[in-house]
Amino acid sequence: MRFLVDANVSPRVAALLAAADHDAVAVRDVGLAAAPDDDILDWALTGDRVIVSHDTDFGTLLAARRQVKPSFILVRSSDPLTADDVAGLLLANLDSVAEDLGAGAIVTFARGRLRVRRLPLG
């Protein structure tokens, strides 16, 4: 799977996903560290990448645009998560949501729960 890891998620998550044989890059590594969310969304769409973020704004943008892609993984936690925690959470659950992400979805990951909403929203 192809991932774009947002600036508010440790770039180490991209490295850990890449080490697990996924094509993963961090926004800072592709010149998007200070880019607005719209630009990040467009870049992910062009590259058929799943955005990984703690930022709920991507869901709002996808709903406003009524887009089917790119898929978006929202990582939520009331406790701070390390890069290893985030990557572990994703890798442990990717098989169960791969079809949804491939079709276009917002997937919310949190410890102990998972929510999938197919795109477009609305």
Each predicted region: which residue ranges?
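Acidic, metal-binding active-site segment of PIN/NYN-like and related structure-specific nucleases
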Residues: 45-62
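N-terminal beta1-alpha1 ligand-phosphate binding loop
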Residues: 2-11
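Mid-chain, well-packed structural core segment of small domains
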Residues: 59-93
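Basic nucleic-acid-binding interfaces
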Residues: 10-12, 24-47, 64-66, 79-81, ...
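Charged phosphate-binding loop/patch that engages nucleotide di/tri-phosphates or the phosphate backbone
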Residues: 95-122
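Short helix-loop-beta junction
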Residues: 16-24
